[in-house]
A protein has these predicted regions:
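Conserved core of the sugar-phosphate nucleotidyltransferase
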Residues: 112-173
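Short catalytic helix/loop segments, enriched in acidic residues and glycine
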Residues: 20-35
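Short beta-strand-to-loop acidic/aromatic patch adjacent to the donor-nucleotide binding site
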Residues: 100-110
Length: 173
């Protein structure tokens, strides 16, 4: 299974921190967000990675090549990162993932490696890991029906109907 990591965004809400550094390379403690994600994925057996970059692409490429030189990493550049969102970045991966199982995640989330393990060992075809907390207007919200099937994933859906924020695994995109 391949890991698809979306890392194209500008993260303008974090300025001035992101004026010279992409959000995924910001450190929490001793390690940056992207390093934490890579370590968790490698710990769970991932050895193929697709990274969609945009803003400050070369910094991300340089970091990953320096820290993970033996990993199989495909870089895809979203040249429209200033005017598009994660859905477009994901769309750019289609020729690399067509019909294959993937684990999809944003590059700027902090998660326990055990979440990846639980996702991988699920008997479900398509699953999402959700963080249940009070949601703001900028979070991507998830709406489910009475049978717990996902019916909408969006920033614009009503917070009152959302059950959590997505940190996705989708088996076939």
């Amino acid at each position: 299974m391949k890991a698809v990591i979306l890392a194209a965004g500008i993260a303008s809400r974090l300025r001035p921190l992101t004026d010279t550094t992409p959000k995924c390379l910001l450190k929490i403690g001793e390690r940056c967000l992207l390093e934490r994600a890579f370590d968790a994925l490698i710990q769970n057996g991932f050895d193929e990675f697709i990274i969609v970059t945009g803003y400050r692409q070369q910094q991300i490429v340089d970091f990953l090549q320096a820290h993970y030189p033996t990993q199989d990493i495909t870089f895809i550049y979203n040249d429209r990162y200033e005017s598009t969102n994660n859905i477009y970045s994901l769309w750019l991966t289609r020729s690399y993932t067509d019909g294959q199982e993937i684990l999809l995640l944003d590059s700027d989330i902090v998660f326990d490696p055990q979440i990846v393990e639980k996702l991988l060992h699920s008997d479900k075809d398509d699953i999402l890991a959700l963080n249940r907390h009070e949601l703001g207007a900028e979070e991507i919200k998830v709406i489910v029906d009475d049978a717990q099937k996902v019916v909408e994933i969006s920033k614009v859906c009503s917070i009152s109907y959302a059950i959590g924020e997505s940190i996705d695994r989708k088996s076939v995109v």
